Amino acid sequence: MPATAYERVVYKSPSEYHYMKVCLEFQEHGVGLNVAQFKQLLVSALRDLFGEVGAALPVDVLTYDEKTLSAILRICSSGLVKLWSSLTLFGAYKSKKCAFRVIQVSPFLLALSGNSREQVLD
């Protein structure tokens, strides 16, 4: 019986940035945030989990919709896991329970323009 050799291959993305489509959901309806408050919420989530080092990560809000509380974020690829984990563990804003939903993540901004799961074929 021949021995099987396995090789571990790790792919490191050459992209400098990753893009995230996220949505903030509150348990109560009627909570509104402007883009500055939303950005501060992101920085607070990073600070809560990773301290000042996390808060210093460069996160850009490329688009923001105040009605749906959804945004497209740009983060340096090295900070993607930190941002994602801090958003996952974030749970309250001004004593109101909330949760971030990560809808899509891609190293390509164009990939976030559509969702194949919602595509309607004729």
Curated annotation (Swiss-Prot):
One annotated Gene Ontology cellular component of this protein: nucleolus
Gene Ontology biological process terms, A to Z: tRNA 5'-leader removal
GO molecular function: ribonuclease P activity; ribonuclease P RNA binding
Keyword terms of this UniProt record: Nucleus, tRNA processing
Keyword Chloroplast in annotation: no
Subcellular compartments: Nucleus, Nucleolus
Keyword Transferase: no
Family membership noted in the UniProt record: Belongs to the eukaryotic/archaeal RNase P protein component 2 family.
Entry function: Component of ribonuclease P, a ribonucleoprotein complex that generates mature tRNA molecules by cleaving their 5'-ends.
Complexes and interactors: RNase P consists of a catalytic RNA moiety and about 10 protein subunits; POP1, POP4, POP5, POP7, RPP14, RPP21, RPP25, RPP30, RPP38 and RPP40. Within the RNase P complex, POP1, POP7 and RPP25 form the 'finger' subcomplex, POP5, RPP14, RPP40 and homodimeric RPP30 form the 'palm' subcomplex, and RPP21, POP4 and RPP38 form the 'wrist' subcomplex. All subunits of the RNase P complex interact with the catalytic RNA.
Protein name: Ribonuclease P protein subunit p14
Annotated organism of origin: Mus musculus
Gene name in the database record: Rpp14
